Amino acid sequence: NVEWKNVADQSELIDVLNNNNSAIAIFDMHGGHSDNGEGFLVLQNKAINISSLLGKIKIPPIVILSACDTSPIDNNHYSVANMFLLAGAKTVLASALPIMSKQASVYIARLLIRVSIFLYIHLFKHNKSIRWSTFISGMTKQSYYTELIYKLQDCKIINGKQNQELNFFVN
């Protein structure tokens, strides 16, 4: 089950998180990191520092951040990703660089499909466990190759039939 919540401000965010019993929370919004400060997410054009929510929110074990610069490699450790870890998340998927909204949306859709179908089959039909890192890294590799294949087609290096064959092979 996927439940979508749009929040307008910090108090709504706190309420939604504290009333959430899901294993995964996905934040699909603008994000960033100030030059000398900390990472932030943007709600209704207002930057929210996750550190200001520490001790006020209940965080699910898995947090997915579909927002730019939520774990930047060129700034301090006060990133959005690290703040969610401090708030109680067991794992956080974040971006080190700016991301494109279309590709981020496709990635999130693939993640939701992979969780609901692949993970379910793997765990309950085959009775096998899988490490979260293996699950995510496999999906990320597949997403990378899919984007690369589409880029090759856009640049006229391969045709549509080759795109289909390569995507079938990769996925």
What does each model-found stretch correspond to?
Residues 1-27, 32-53:
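Functional beta-strand-loop-alpha-helix junction segments that form "active/interaction loops"
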Residues 22-28, 58-60, 95-96:
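Functionally constrained cores in energy, signaling, and assembly domains
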Residues 18-20, 51-58, 79-88:
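Mature extracellular/periplasmic domains of secretome proteins
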Residues 61-171:
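Active-site-proximal C-terminal subdomain of hydrolase catalytic domains
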Residues 31-32, 37-39, 55, 88, ...:
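Residue-identity detector for glycine
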